[in-house]
């Protein structure tokens, strides 16, 4: 899809800085995008492309993950929220006046990611009850689930992160997840990059993470869930139990620069960015 013509000039200096001609957005003409660290690589590349093509001024940030982005959207701080989860009832209750309008841009999988020595030591697949036991610190050594004699260290995502919500739904359904365990081998982390760094540096570590974020990192592996591996086919079919859609969300129908941005991401050029970062495209989901 060809993006519309150029817009007036302005200045910008925060976040992922893309300066040039101004798009409809904030008071200074800047289009502001924030939220999910999973969606961020696609949005950042799309912002760069639109800067190069028509000089739009755009910031892309990741404050607070998916829930943080949705809150900023409804507070009028940003124009587009990146979300790696559907808009939840809790989001609507928090901001009842917000007209959440999601645009799906692709599909991702959340994996239960372990260190390579755990995977090679025999932990290739886990059941939901085993994952629950691990994250609740009732299972504390990998030998209890067929792995090496190695203590488990859990890195869980902070509340409000899309990845955390996908894991909680898989493990607990509609029930509330229990509070974090009182354990010195459990820690809360934020974005995907931080999670990956912690997993790589901690023996016996495990945590939920987008499977695309471990591509090119041989020190990490995604275990199968109930015997189902996360592949393009199982993600598209929904057979993999922690598949999730990726969204760009606006407050009401997108207009002006926000519409230009959304149109680009769902265009052929934008979908190539989705594929580049390891996510399934809309065409792949359509079969």
Where are these regions (language model features)?
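Secretory targeting and sorting signals
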Residues: 1-25
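Short acidic (Asp/Glu) patches
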Residues: 94-98
């Amino acid at each position: 899809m060809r993006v519309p013509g150029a817009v007036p000039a302005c200045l910008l200096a925060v976040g992922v800085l893309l300066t040039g001609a101004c798009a409809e957005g904030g008071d200074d003409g800047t289009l502001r995008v924030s939220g999910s660290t999973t969606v961020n690589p696609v949005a950042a590349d799309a912002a760069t492309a639109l800067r190069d093509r028509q000089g739009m001024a755009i910031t892309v940030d990741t404050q607070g993950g998916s829930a943080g982005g949705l809150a900023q959207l409804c507070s009028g701080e940003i124009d587009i929220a990146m979300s790696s989860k559907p808009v939840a009832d809790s989001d609507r209750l928090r901001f009842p006046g917000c007209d959440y309008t999601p645009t799906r841009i692709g599909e991702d999988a959340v994996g239960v990611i372990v260190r390579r020595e755990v995977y090679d030591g025999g932990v290739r697949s886990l059941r939901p009850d085993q994952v629950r036991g691990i994250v609740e610190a009732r299972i504390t050594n990998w030998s209890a689930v067929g792995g090496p004699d190695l203590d488990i260290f859990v890195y869980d995502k902070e509340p409000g992160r899309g990845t955390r919500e996908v894991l909680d739904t898989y493990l607990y359904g509609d029930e509330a997840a229990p509070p974090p365990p009182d354990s010195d081998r459990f820690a809360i982390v934020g974005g995907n990059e931080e999670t990956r760094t912690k997993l790589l540096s901690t023996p016996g570590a495990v945590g939920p993470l987008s499977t695309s974020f471990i591509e090119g990192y041989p020190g990490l592996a995604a275990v199968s869930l109930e015997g189902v591996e996360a592949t393009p086919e199982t993600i598209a079919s929904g057979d993999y139990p922690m598949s999730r859609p990726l969204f760009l969300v606006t407050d009401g129908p997108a207009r002006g620069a926000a519409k230009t941005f959304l149109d680009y991401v769902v265009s052929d050029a934008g979908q190539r960015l989705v594929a580049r970062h390891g996510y399934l495209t809309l065409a792949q989901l359509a079969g």
